[in-house]
UniProtKB/Swiss-Prot annotation:
This is Homoserine O-acetyltransferase. The gene is MET2. It comes from the Eukaryota. Residues 290-303 have a biased composition (Basic and acidic residues). Transmembrane segments: none annotated. Residues 69-468 form the AB hydrolase-1 domain. The active site is at S182, S182 (nucleophile), D435, H464. The lineage of its organism: Eukaryota, Fungi, Dikarya, Ascomycota, Pezizomycotina.
Length: 518
């Protein structure tokens, strides 16, 4: 699917250089047909200055003559600027993201590997990738400007946030609505603080007014998974040998928070994968010794294992030689082990049967009394394997730390509720009853303290990811809200947009399949 990407004839000449490649970043080409603006210098909230700072974005639809039919969509943690990739069923004429009525803009957040400044992009001052030296960026760095500050020389300076610079460069005069879920909902709330004269309405799904201790803790556990991978190397790893194991473990942990216990139970229960496809655990051949069978069960699922090693004949701490290399081992082939008996110091008395690993009586694996490999495990491993091919470990660390900075009251008011009361726009809050990450109680809090808010509930057992799964409900709630608060846009006949809207296509990042095809 490719939607028209253009602005009205009144759009000004673009101020910032545009590029179409990012050769230093192996993840850039995962997102198709995106634009990248290069900001010559940009000052972060921390005071750090980024030079030649890239911002990736995509647009859909047409900017009208008054430049005020703009819909900004903000992506979630591992999303990109390609809305079609993760919210495709909602985009197109007559749908919530109506390309015949709105000019839709989605910018990639800093820290993400999909084109904006991140650990994967070049530091122009050194000519090298930032890697672990990429500075902390906040939700506010992405979105809004800070207060006007009186400088030492008496002049006034306003710090503009980076997505606002893109809006200005596209000729946007007013934003009709900002929409985002999860991390994107955090950005949507921050957009509201531009005021109702610039941002007319807000839709926030499955998000919070500030990142909770629960969410901070999950992010920490996921980062520690990455740190524990020896290949992480303080973040100075090469793209040819990244910390896949740690990043995969972090993704597994995250997936458990995106669903609910009941959704996992109903989908998997205690089912096991097809035994005909997995005759031997982690190997392509049966075990040759009882200890090897025990080893296989014990290490099943460990991707970096080196292979079964027969016990040593000495008391030395030196590792004994492996007998074979597992099919999942990342090491080179290893020479066969000695034929020395397992415990020669414990000689068998006369009359005792020969051990089952002898040549005369080859070992036969015993029938296991219970399953040791379940479909739920298979699902997590499969999704982790997909994810590590499309995401970067340093970026995962950077963007989860960005989440930790989120608190709409920080630097604004003494209490959270006072900060929410500052939001003047009509606001739609959508929550999921079974969401254990951004709880429904947090959505109720947003709706209670934002003065012109209304709350909609999604009754789904699918947990947090329901905001990306329950397309019909989300589409209906957003359309109803926009017809209520923006009749001047929704009441007009839409312009013709050449597109293949509604066409089902494969997700380029795998985000759609990860969420819906489980």
């Amino acid at each position: 699917m490719h939607l028209v990407d253009r602005v009205g004839a009144n759009a000004p000449h673009k101020k910032y250089e545009r590029v179409t490649t990012q050769p230093e970043n192996p993840f850039f080409n995962i997102v198709h047909n995106q634009s990248v603006a290069i900001i010559p210098s940009f000052t972060l909230e921390s005071g750090v200055i980024l030079y030649d700072c890239p911002v990736a974005y995509k647009t859909f639809g047409v900017l009208n003559e008054s430049a005020d039919n703009v819909m900004v969509i903000c992506h979630a943690l591992t999303g990109s600027a390609d809305v079609e990739d993760w919210w495709g069923p909602l985009i197109g004429p007559g749908r919530a993201f109506d390309t015949s009525r709105y000019f839709i803009v989605c910018c990639n957040s800093m820290g993400s590997p999909y084109g904006s400044a991140s650990p994967c992009t070049l530091d122009s001052t050194t000519g090298r990738r930032y890697g672990p030296e990429f500075p902390l960026t906040t939700v506010r760095d992405d979105v809004r400007y800070g207060s006007t500050i009186t400088m030492k020389l008496g002049c006034l300076l306003t710090y503009y946030r980076i997505h606002k610079l893109i809006m200005d460069d596209l000729g946007v005069r007013q934003i009709a609505v900002v929409i985002g879920g999860s991390m994107g909902g955090m950005l949507a709330l921050e957009w509201a603080y531009f005021g109702k004269d610039y941002v007319k309405a807000v839709v926030a799904l499955a998000t919070s007014a500030r990142h909770s201790a629960w969410c901070i803790s999950w992010g920490e556990a996921q980062r520690q998974s990455i740190y524990s991978d020896p290949k992480y190397d303080d973040g100075y790893y090469s793209f040819s040998d990244p910390p896949y194991t740690g990043l995969g473990a972090a993704r597994m942990s995250a997936l458990l928070t995106y669903r609910s216990r009941n959704s996992f139970e109903s989908r998997f229960g205690r089912n096991i994968p097809d035994p005909s496809r997995h005759p031997y655990i982690n190997t392509s051949q049966p075990p040759s010794h009882p200890a090897e069978e025990h080893y296989d069960i014990h290490n099943e699922g460990f991707r970096n294992r080196k292979g079964f090693r027969r016990s040593s004949t000495t008391t030395s701490d030196a590792p004994p030689s492996p007998t074979r290399t597992s099919s999942t081992s990342s090491t080179d082939a290893i020479t066969p082990a000695s034929t020395t008996p397992l415990h020669p110091s414990r000689a068998q008395p006369s009359g005792i049967a020969t051990p089952p690993n002898s040549v005369s009586d080859p070992f036969r694996p015993v029938k296991r009394p219970c399953p040791t490999y379940f479909s739920a495990q298979s699902y997590l491993r499969y999704q982790a394997d997909k994810f590590v091919k499309r995401f970067d470990a340093n970026c995962y660390i950077a963007i989860t730390r960005k989440l930790d900075t989120h608190d709409v009251s920080r630097g604004r008011t003494s209490t959270l509720h006072e900060a929410l009361a500052m939001i003047e726009q009509p606001t739609l809050i959508i929550g999921i009853e079974s969401d254990g990450l951004f709880t429904f109680a947090e959505q109720m809090e947003l709706a209670e303290y934002i003065p012109d808010a209304r709350l909609k509930r999604i009754d789904s057992p699918e947990g947090h990811d329901a905001f990306l799964i329950m397309f019909a409900e989300v589409n209906r709630y957003i359309c109803e809200f926009l017809r209520e608060v923006q009749p001047e846009i929704m009441g007009k006949e839409g312009v013709h947009v050449e597109s293949k809207v509604g066409e089902i296509r494969a997700s380029t990042t795998g985000e759609v399949e990860d969420i819906t095809h489980w």
